[in-house]
């Protein structure tokens, strides 16, 4: 029986060597403990700091500006050294950012979609250099890799909470928008077949716009966006199609005024929901920060009280009055002291008079309010005797 168990175990191992490696590696990796907690905490504080975010936003923005200058051949020729230096600086900054984030949390870093977007952008950065080294400068598709460098501006998404909120809203509307687009496609399919049969006849039909299904779909898309629909309708009127105007008006009403507005409405609804959720999360974060600050203050107060109690326990004084007397003996003639007759000082008298003025103003306003309340109540009492006989008359009539 032990041999059979050993054979079965060996058969499983031999069938999946990758699983065996992962099974052996995971416990070892879980038991692994890093000894650089202080350094990692410092790097994390640097990454989460406001100054670091400002540096990254400024770097990405300046690189986008230099890329706009790079599109001009004259500027590229005259500022070649500056553009090359800015390129090297930007690539080094982005690579350093990636290295720092992976160093802080090498496992959870890959679970964030925006971090994966940064990795893809860095791969796109190195793509032109790799193609020039491997395929040469005359490679056919090298211009595509150069054009993809415009994706660098997407690094700003990770540093803008507002943009992330909008992207979340767009992601939540995928299924609803897909349903709306499917309905619009079905509507266009029905009208494309109908338009091909009505206006795409071989004899006197409009072959450019309705000659086949693909042309009919493209024409209907122009009608749905209400782009040049008058020119399309004029071509149908020139061929004297009887139902052309009814066809065009009905499709524009359904496609443009209903489905496209429905699409916009769905986007607005989900965007508002995402904004409300973002505001709630921001409020919770502010409350957590406030509670954290309060906890720090309370902890400091507790430590101070504990320190004072410890000092009092270790003191030689038997009572508080004795402690005060001993404290007075340590005073010199140059030490500042708070006088007991604070109520007779000029600042206190000034504040006291101002408080009395505020109190008189408040009493005066309250009296005016009471007068208005009494006046309203008197008017209500005057109306009550007039309503009472009417109710009695109704009772008598019954």
Swiss-Prot record:
An annotated GO cellular component: motile cilium
Q: Which UniProt keywords apply?
A: Calcium, Calcium channel, Calcium transport, Cell membrane, Cell projection, Cilium, Developmental protein, Differentiation, Flagellum, Ion channel, Ion transport, Membrane, Spermatogenesis, Transmembrane, Transmembrane helix, Transport, Voltage-gated channel
Claim: Transmembrane is one of the keywords in the record: yes
According to the record, the parts of this chain that enter the bilayer without crossing it are found at 217-236
- The organism's superkingdom is given as Eukaryota
> What influences the activity of this protein, per its activity regulation comment?
The CatSper calcium channel is indirectly activated by extracellular progesterone and prostaglandins following the sequence: progesterone > PGF1-alpha = PGE1 > PGA1 > PGE2 >> PGD2. The CatSper calcium channel is directly inhibited by endocannabinoid 2-arachidonoylglycerol (2AG). Indirect activation by progesterone takes place via the following mechanism: progesterone binds and activates the acylglycerol lipase ABHD2, which in turn mediates hydrolysis of 2AG inhibitor, relieving inhibition of the CatSper channel.
Q: Name one GO molecular function term.
A: voltage-gated calcium channel activity
| Membrane disposition | Multi-pass membrane protein
GO terms (BP aspect): establishment of localization in cell; flagellated sperm motility; sodium ion transport; sperm capacitation
Question: So which tissues is this one expressed in?
Answer: Testis-specific.
Any ranges marked Cytoplasmic in the topology annotation, and which?
1-48, 108, 161-168, 269-398
The residue ranges crossing the membrane are 49-71, 81-107, 109-131, 144-160, 169-195, 243-268
Q: What subcellular compartments does it reside in? A: Cell projection, Cilium, Flagellum membrane
Residues on Extracellular side: 72-80, 132-143, 196-216, 237-242
Give one Pfam family: Ion_trans
Q: Which SUPFAM superfamilies match?
A: Voltage-gated potassium channels
Reactions catalysed according to its record: Ca(2+)(in) = Ca(2+)(out)
Q: How does it assemble?
A: Component of the CatSper complex or CatSpermasome composed of the core pore-forming members CATSPER1, CATSPER2, CATSPER3 and CATSPER4 as well as auxiliary members CATSPERB, CATSPERG, CATSPERD, CATSPERE, CATSPERZ, C2CD6/CATSPERT, TMEM249, TMEM262 and EFCAB9. HSPA1 may be an additional auxiliary complex member. The core complex members CATSPER1, CATSPER2, CATSPER3 and CATSPER4 form a heterotetrameric channel.
Q: Please give the family membership noted in the entry.
A: Belongs to the cation channel sperm-associated (TC 1.A.1.19) family.
Described function: Pore-forming subunit of the CatSper complex, a sperm-specific voltage-gated calcium channel that plays a central role in calcium-dependent physiological responses essential for successful fertilization, such as sperm hyperactivation, acrosome reaction and chemotaxis towards the oocyte.
State the name under which the record lists this protein: Cation channel sperm-associated protein 3
What species does this protein belong to? Homo sapiens (Human)
Q: What is the lineage of its organism?
A: Eukaryota, Metazoa, Chordata, Craniata, Vertebrata
């Amino acid at each position: 029986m032990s041999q059979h168990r050993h054979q079965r175990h060996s058969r499983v191992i031999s069938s999946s060597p990758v699983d065996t490696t992962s099974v052996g590696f995971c416990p070892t990796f879980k038991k692994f403990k890093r000894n650089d907690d202080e350094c990692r905490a410092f790097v994390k504080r640097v990454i989460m700091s406001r100054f670091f975010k400002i540096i990254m936003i400024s770097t990405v923005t300046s690189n986008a500006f230099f890329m706009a200058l790079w599109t001009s051949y004259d500027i590229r020729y005259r500022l070649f050294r500056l553009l090359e230096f800015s390129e090297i600086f930007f690539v080094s900054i982005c690579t350093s950012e990636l290295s720092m984030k992976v160093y802080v949390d090498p496992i959870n870093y890959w679970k964030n979609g925006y971090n994966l977007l940064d990795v893809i952008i860095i791969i796109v950065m190195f793509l032109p250099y790799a193609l020039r080294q491997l395929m040469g400068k005359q490679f056919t598709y090298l211009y595509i890799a150069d054009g993809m460098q415009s994706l660098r501006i997407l690094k700003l998404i990770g540093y803008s909470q507002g943009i992330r909120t909008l992207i979340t809203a767009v992601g939540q509307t995928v299924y609803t928008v897909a349903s709306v687009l499917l309905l619009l496609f079905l509507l266009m399919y029905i009208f494309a077949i109908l338009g091909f049969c009505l206006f795409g006849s071989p004899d006197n039909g409009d072959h450019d716009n309705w000659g086949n299904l693909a042309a009919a779909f493209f024409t209907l898309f122009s009608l749905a966006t209400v782009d040049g629909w008058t020119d399309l309708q004029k071509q149908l009127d020139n061929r004297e199609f009887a139902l052309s105007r009814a066809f065009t008006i009905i499709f524009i009403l359904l496609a443009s005024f209903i489905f496209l507005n429905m699409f916009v409405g769905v986007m607005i609804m989900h965007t508002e929901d995402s904004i409300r959720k973002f505001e709630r999360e921001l409020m919770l974060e502010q409350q957590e920060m406030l509670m954290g600050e309060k906890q720090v203050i309370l902890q400091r107060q507790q430590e101070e009280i504990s320190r004072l109690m410890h000092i009092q326990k270790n003191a030689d004084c038997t009572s508080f009055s004795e402690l005060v007397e001993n404290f007075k003996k340590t005073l010199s003639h140059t030490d500042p002291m708070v006088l007991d007759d604070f109520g007779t000082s000029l600042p206190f008298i000034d504040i006291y008079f101002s408080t009395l003025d505020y109190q008189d103003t408040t009493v005066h306003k309250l009296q005016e309010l009471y007068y208005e309340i009494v006046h309203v109540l008197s008017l209500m009492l005057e109306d009550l005797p007039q309503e009472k006989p009417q109710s009695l008359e109704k009772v008598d009539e019954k």
